[in-house]
Amino acid sequence: MNEKDLVILEQYDLHVQSTRRGRGSFLCDTDRGLVQVTEFSGSQERLFFQNRVLFFLTERGIRCDLLLENTEGNLVTSDRYGNGYVVKKWFSGRECDTKSREDIVGAVHYLARLHNVLRLPEIQEFQMAAAQTDETDTAEEKKIRK
């Protein structure tokens, strides 16, 4: 992906103020906050399921990178060459310092909170949807999960 490919952002209801490179992505400051643009090649059904889970977590106070829909209501947007991209609501922060006890303890607490939220009875609907999604996964996706 290069700067020319950022024209895919025209398919979103966003006004880009600035862009910079991230790890395998572009980060864009917009009127709706920070977003990340990354290349995507996978199942749209799985992506839809993933976004439902992330939204579920966000509603319960877990900070997540939510996928944004383009103006047509799709999660994946293609560039002029047919490459798929996703745009995620992003947030700035620093990485966990693995040499810092305080950072590690904080990460463990947050991970425990994440696990507790995902154990709620409401998550059963997501588990059933996941089982259905697993049946429609491509061979490539099944291979990656093994």
Locate each region found by the language model.
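Conserved NTP-binding catalytic cores of kinases and kinase-like/nucleotidyltransferase enzymes
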Residues: 1-72
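Amphipathic, soluble alpha/beta structural segments
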Residues: 17-24, 92-96, 103, 141-145
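Conserved short hydrophobic patches within well-ordered secondary structure
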Residues: 37, 54, 88, 111-118, ...
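Generic hydrophobic, aliphatic-rich segments that mediate packing or membrane embedding
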Residues: 49-53, 63, 83-84, 103, ...
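Short, glycine/charge-rich beta-strand/loop segments that flank catalytic centers
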Residues: 65-76, 125-130
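Conserved structural core of kinase catalytic domains
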Residues: 74-106
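Conserved kinase catalytic-core helix
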Residues: 94-128
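Active-site catalytic-loop/activation-segment of kinase and kinase-like phosphoryl-transfer enzymes
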Residues: 128-146
